[in-house]
Amino acid sequence: VSRELALHGVEHAVVDGRAAPGDVWRDRWDTLRLFTPAHLSSLPGMPFPAPRRYLPRGSEFGGYLDEYAERFNVPLHPHTHVRGLKRTATGAGFTAETDEGAWLARRVVVATGFATHPRIPTIGQDLDPSIAQLHSSAYHRPTDLPEGPVLVVGCGTSGVQLGVELARSGRDVTVAGKPTPRVPRVVSDHAFGLLLAIFHHVFTRATPIGRGSVRDVIRGGGGPLIGISPEDLMAAGAARGARLAGTRDGQPDLEDGRVLTVSSVLWATGFRHDFTWIQDLPVDEDGLPRHTRGMSEDWAGLSFMGLPFQFALSSMTIYGVGRDAAYVAAALARSTGASAR
């Protein structure tokens, strides 16, 4: 968005609570890899510096974001955590309360992403206190967990990746959750670009099939397994388990009737959204801002990036973010009277 605003000649500032743009990726587990190859993991104006089919590590993509911000002179203000956002008394602008004081702006782009708060099922409260619990967002490597058997809860791409890593490190691992559809490896290797193109051009809010899919996508949770499969779990020596139903005597109780004795539980259960930090923001029945392609339908001057199905199924991918950023920036530029590009 910053690059697009600069192309339009719109003066702006970018505030971030972290030290550098790529820190959000460097804070994930050490072996994390993107599921999109390098040529589909690039932002507009700067290709990812790797062979086309290379799957970048999370830390490598973090470095790429740092270089991107430097190349395009992003006016970044790091270590500036926004605690709250509200409209001014006149409704003609916004006040952002930060650790460095208040910021005033006529227009704001909320680019915090869709779901940023770890989702941990309430079942976790019933586990024996001796069982260590960790969400995937706080996990970096197998040594973060105490010795002994591990239950990974969640069978999405993250859960399977983590289950494989832990099993290969010598842990006794069970990965529990409902079966997740997967993209066959032949598609991952040879036709993933075509699949993303369909997500980008066919499943959009401008097509009947796209509009009919919006609610299912928003409410349906995670996507299919890409670049990894349940077979990889078995090959690594991990066990598959049914969904976590509850606890029995403080131990995890699975829907298939098994009660596991574990020393730790790793929650690979995703993230939830929370827009309550934006004071009095109107939201829809799913708790999301009402918007048209990221532009608030309720508050003039407020826009968003990274919402689920913001315009297309690709909107939550690196591949799709450029088009959404261009649209939002162009709309903001028109509202300021700027036209340089």
Q: How would you name each of these model-derived features?
A:
Residues V1-R18, G22-V24, R53-R341:
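Flavin (primarily FAD) cofactor-binding/catalytic cores of flavoenzymes
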Residues P47-R53:
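A short acidic, helix-capping loop that chelates divalent metal ions and anchors anionic groups
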